[in-house]
Protein backbone atom coordinates (compact mmCIF):
# COMPACT_ATOMS: atom_id res chain seq x y z
CA UNK A 1 0.00 0.00 0.00
CA UNK A 2 2.83 2.42 0.85
CA UNK A 3 4.47 1.66 -2.49
CA UNK A 4 1.26 2.41 -4.41
CA UNK A 5 0.77 5.66 -2.48
CA UNK A 6 4.37 6.74 -3.14
CA UNK A 7 4.03 5.87 -6.84
CA UNK A 8 0.80 7.91 -7.14
CA UNK A 9 2.37 10.86 -5.32
CA UNK A 10 5.31 10.89 -7.73
CA UNK A 11 3.04 10.66 -10.79
CA UNK A 12 0.73 13.43 -9.58
CA UNK A 13 3.62 15.80 -8.83
CA UNK A 14 5.22 15.10 -12.23
CA UNK A 15 2.00 15.73 -14.16
CA UNK A 16 1.39 19.15 -12.61
CA UNK A 17 4.40 20.95 -14.07
CA UNK A 18 6.87 20.27 -16.79
CA UNK A 19 10.02 21.76 -18.16
CA UNK A 20 10.51 23.61 -21.43
CA UNK A 21 14.03 23.77 -22.84
CA UNK A 22 14.87 26.32 -25.53
CA UNK A 23 18.11 26.63 -27.53
CA UNK A 24 18.78 30.03 -29.12
CA UNK A 25 21.74 31.35 -31.10
CA UNK A 26 22.38 35.12 -31.20
CA UNK A 27 23.77 36.10 -34.60
CA UNK A 28 24.67 39.34 -36.37
CA UNK A 29 25.50 37.87 -39.77
CA UNK A 30 22.02 37.08 -41.02
CA UNK A 31 20.66 38.07 -44.41
CA UNK A 32 17.14 38.73 -45.62
CA UNK A 33 16.19 39.19 -49.29
CA UNK A 34 13.40 41.76 -49.66
CA UNK A 35 10.77 42.10 -52.42
CA UNK A 36 12.93 44.17 -54.81
CA UNK A 37 15.76 41.61 -54.61
CA UNK A 38 18.04 43.62 -52.33
CA UNK A 39 19.74 41.77 -49.49
CA UNK A 40 19.64 43.27 -46.01
CA UNK A 41 21.98 42.40 -43.17
CA UNK A 42 19.96 41.38 -40.12
CA UNK A 43 20.64 40.47 -36.51
CA UNK A 44 18.56 37.89 -34.77
CA UNK A 45 18.00 34.72 -32.83
CA UNK A 46 18.28 31.42 -34.69
CA UNK A 47 17.29 27.91 -33.57
CA UNK A 48 20.63 26.45 -34.71
CA UNK A 49 23.98 27.38 -36.26
CA UNK A 50 23.01 26.30 -39.78
CA UNK A 51 20.28 28.87 -40.43
CA UNK A 52 20.07 32.62 -40.86
CA UNK A 53 18.05 34.21 -38.08
CA UNK A 54 14.35 34.40 -38.99
CA UNK A 55 12.45 37.61 -38.31
CA UNK A 56 10.81 37.40 -35.85
CA UNK A 57 12.97 34.91 -33.97
CA UNK A 58 11.88 31.39 -33.00
CA UNK A 59 8.67 31.04 -31.00
CA UNK A 60 9.11 30.12 -27.33
CA UNK A 61 6.07 28.16 -26.10
CA UNK A 62 5.32 26.93 -22.60
CA UNK A 63 2.38 26.20 -20.34
CA UNK A 64 1.56 28.32 -17.33
CA UNK A 65 3.54 26.98 -14.37
CA UNK A 66 6.24 25.33 -16.52
CA UNK A 67 9.91 25.81 -15.73
CA UNK A 68 11.51 27.38 -18.81
CA UNK A 69 15.25 27.12 -19.45
CA UNK A 70 16.81 29.08 -22.31
CA UNK A 71 20.34 28.13 -23.36
CA UNK A 72 21.53 31.23 -25.23
CA UNK A 73 24.72 31.11 -27.31
CA UNK A 74 26.20 34.36 -28.63
CA UNK A 75 28.06 33.77 -31.90
CA UNK A 76 27.75 37.39 -33.07
CA UNK A 77 30.62 39.50 -34.32
CA UNK A 78 32.14 40.70 -31.03
CA UNK A 79 28.85 42.11 -29.69
CA UNK A 80 27.39 41.47 -26.23
CA UNK A 81 23.74 40.37 -26.13
CA UNK A 82 21.01 39.58 -23.63
CA UNK A 83 17.53 38.12 -23.73
CA UNK A 84 15.00 40.42 -22.09
CA UNK A 85 11.72 38.63 -21.39
CA UNK A 86 9.46 41.60 -22.06
CA UNK A 87 6.32 41.63 -19.92
CA UNK A 88 7.03 38.41 -18.04
CA UNK A 89 7.26 38.62 -14.27
CA UNK A 90 10.71 37.07 -13.75
CA UNK A 91 13.44 37.68 -11.20
CA UNK A 92 15.98 40.40 -11.90
CA UNK A 93 18.87 38.01 -12.49
CA UNK A 94 17.03 36.48 -15.49
CA UNK A 95 15.49 39.65 -16.92
CA UNK A 96 18.21 40.40 -19.51
CA UNK A 97 18.63 44.07 -18.59
CA UNK A 98 22.27 45.24 -18.84
CA UNK A 99 23.95 46.07 -15.51
CA UNK A 100 21.01 44.50 -13.61
CA UNK A 101 21.32 40.93 -14.84
CA UNK A 102 24.03 39.54 -17.14
CA UNK A 103 25.30 40.08 -20.68
CA UNK A 104 26.44 37.17 -22.81
CA UNK A 105 29.79 37.95 -24.41
CA UNK A 106 30.88 36.97 -27.92
CA UNK A 107 31.42 33.19 -28.22
CA UNK A 108 29.99 32.54 -24.78
CA UNK A 109 26.64 31.30 -23.51
CA UNK A 110 24.28 31.96 -20.65
CA UNK A 111 21.24 30.31 -19.12
CA UNK A 112 17.97 32.11 -18.50
CA UNK A 113 15.52 30.40 -16.14
CA UNK A 114 11.98 31.34 -15.23
CA UNK A 115 8.70 29.80 -14.19
CA UNK A 116 5.99 30.74 -16.73
CA UNK A 117 3.88 32.94 -14.45
CA UNK A 118 0.88 34.16 -16.40
CA UNK A 119 -0.78 32.95 -19.57
CA UNK A 120 -0.53 35.37 -22.48
CA UNK A 121 1.60 36.52 -25.39
CA UNK A 122 4.92 38.18 -24.74
CA UNK A 123 8.09 39.28 -26.50
CA UNK A 124 11.77 38.55 -25.99
CA UNK A 125 14.48 40.83 -27.35
CA UNK A 126 18.09 41.84 -26.90
CA UNK A 127 18.38 44.71 -24.41
CA UNK A 128 21.92 45.77 -25.38
CA UNK A 129 21.74 48.56 -27.95
CA UNK A 130 17.99 48.01 -27.87
CA UNK A 131 16.97 50.30 -30.73
CA UNK A 132 19.49 48.99 -33.26
CA UNK A 133 19.11 45.37 -32.23
CA UNK A 134 15.29 45.48 -32.37
CA UNK A 135 15.32 47.21 -35.76
CA UNK A 136 17.80 44.64 -37.05
CA UNK A 137 15.59 41.72 -35.95
CA UNK A 138 16.70 40.59 -32.49
CA UNK A 139 13.25 39.80 -31.12
CA UNK A 140 10.80 36.91 -31.01
CA UNK A 141 7.42 35.84 -29.62
CA UNK A 142 6.60 34.00 -26.40
CA UNK A 143 3.29 32.21 -25.84
CA UNK A 144 2.38 31.00 -22.35
CA UNK A 145 -0.70 28.79 -22.57
CA UNK A 146 -3.26 28.73 -19.71
CA UNK A 147 -2.85 25.90 -17.21
CA UNK A 148 -6.54 24.98 -17.52
CA UNK A 149 -6.14 24.11 -21.23
CA UNK A 150 -8.49 26.86 -22.42
CA UNK A 151 -7.74 29.05 -25.42
CA UNK A 152 -8.24 32.33 -23.56
CA UNK A 153 -6.18 33.98 -20.87
CA UNK A 154 -8.99 35.91 -19.19
CA UNK A 155 -12.79 36.05 -18.92
CA UNK A 156 -15.23 38.87 -19.56
CA UNK A 157 -13.24 41.19 -21.73
What is the predicted role of each segment?
Residues 17-93, 99-103, 108-109, 144, ...:
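N-terminal, post-signal-peptide metal-ligating segments of extracellular/periplasmic oxidoreductases
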Residues 130-132:
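Short, solvent-exposed loop/turn segments at the edges of extracellular beta-sandwich modules
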Residues 3-13:
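Sec-dependent N-terminal signal peptides
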Amino acid sequence: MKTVFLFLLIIISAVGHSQTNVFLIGRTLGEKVIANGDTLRVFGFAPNLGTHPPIPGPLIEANQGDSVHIDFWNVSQLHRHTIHLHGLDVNQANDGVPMLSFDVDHMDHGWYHFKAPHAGTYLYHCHVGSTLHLQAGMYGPIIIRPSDGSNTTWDGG
